[in-house]
Amino acid sequence: MATLFIADLHLSQQEPAITAGFLRFLAEEAPKAEALYILGDFFDYWIGDDDPQPLHRQVAGALRQLSDNGVPCYFICGNRDFLLGKSYAKRCGMTLLPDEQIITLYGQPILLLHGDTLCSDDRDYQRYRRRVHNPLLQWLFRRLPLRLRLKIAVGMRQQSQRSNSAKAMTIMDVNQETVCATLRRHGVQRMIHGHTHRPALHHFSLDDGRCALRAVLGAWHTHGSMIRVDAQGIHLIELPAHPAEDEIITTRLRSANLV
């Protein structure tokens, strides 16, 4: 058996094909795993565990079924869903992990993280990140009316899109020195992360000559992306394209016993 990792699905009501692709992944790939790790930006935005969107209930039910069937699920928050809390995690049957988590698979320690903290050249974003991760600010935000929270989230998303469109792509990728420093700080040689939407397996050497590996998950825009870790190593896998709209409609009708 293997351990599976995914990130950057950006699930939303506006992208039903991505949701359908994820549900297919839960039905076909995830049940065969020893565990599933979701490394952030699972949802396109998250304004609180009390948001009653039908999508949130649907996803929670599917993850709970996976967990109830014996596949543990773990979650690290991303820059889009860092407000996802214990209440929703409990509904999903998944365990919340800190921003940086070391796990050991087949005798090898691996550092897991979303990946945004590695993009240290993007100083504007890092300043923004420090602000929105302020516990007091988060406490206040969660107590605002749901409609106001949504309005703020939409405005911040639009501002982020405008800001990113003016930035060089290199600024929004990881800084290699930060990568090496993070590995040294944790005393490991392997990491798995998402965030950059640039799926790849990067092999490089640390300052002391030891070999290191940085495995990067892809986004789920048109098809799924996962990393599989088994006894043979770390594998980056591209999943099939998401179901077409007519397939999604047929699946919904079947689930409602209308076809």
From Swiss-Prot:
Q: How does it sit in the membrane?
A: Peripheral membrane protein
Q: Quote the CDD domains the UniProt record gives.
A: MPP_YbbF-LpxH (cd07398)
**What residues does substrate bind to?**
N79, R80, D122, S160, N164, K167, H195
Q: Cofactor(s) for this protein?
A: Mn(2+)
- Cysteine pairings via disulfide bonds: none
Query: Is Heme a UniProt keyword of this protein?
Result: no
UniProtKB keywords = Cell inner membrane, Cell membrane, Hydrolase, Lipid A biosynthesis, Lipid biosynthesis, Lipid metabolism, Manganese, Membrane, Metal-binding
Which EC number(s) does UniProt give? Answer: 3.6.1.54
GO CC annotation? cytoplasm; extrinsic component of plasma membrane
Main localization of the protein described in the UniProt heading: membrane
User: What molecular function does GO assign, one term?
Assistant: manganese ion binding
Which residues does the annotation say bind Mn(2+) 2? D41, N79, H114, H195
- Quote the cofactor binding remark: Binds 2 Mn(2+) ions per subunit in a binuclear metal center.
Catalysis: reaction(s): UDP-2-N,3-O-bis[(3R)-3-hydroxytetradecanoyl]-alpha-D-glucosamine + H2O = 2-N,3-O-bis[(3R)-3-hydroxytetradecanoyl]-alpha-D-glucosaminyl 1-phosphate + UMP + 2 H(+)
The pathway that the record names for this protein is: Glycolipid biosynthesis; lipid IV(A) biosynthesis; lipid IV(A) from (3R)-3-hydroxytetradecanoyl-[acyl-carrier-protein] and UDP-N-acetyl-alpha-D-glucosamine: step 4/6
Q: Which InterPro entries match?
A: Calcineurin-like_PHP_ApaH, LpxH-like, Metallo-depent_PP-like, UDP-diacylglucosamine_Hdrlase
Protein location: Cell inner membrane
Quote the SUPFAM superfamilies the UniProt record gives.
Answer: Metallo-dependent phosphatases
- Residues reported to bind Mn(2+) 1: D8, H10, D41, H197
The record's similarity note reads: Belongs to the LpxH family.
* Role of this protein: Hydrolyzes the pyrophosphate bond of UDP-2,3-diacylglucosamine to yield 2,3-diacylglucosamine 1-phosphate (lipid X) and UMP by catalyzing the attack of water at the alpha-P atom. Involved in the biosynthesis of lipid A, a phosphorylated glycolipid that anchors the lipopolysaccharide to the outer membrane of the cell.
Q: Under what name is this protein listed?
A: UDP-2,3-diacylglucosamine hydrolase
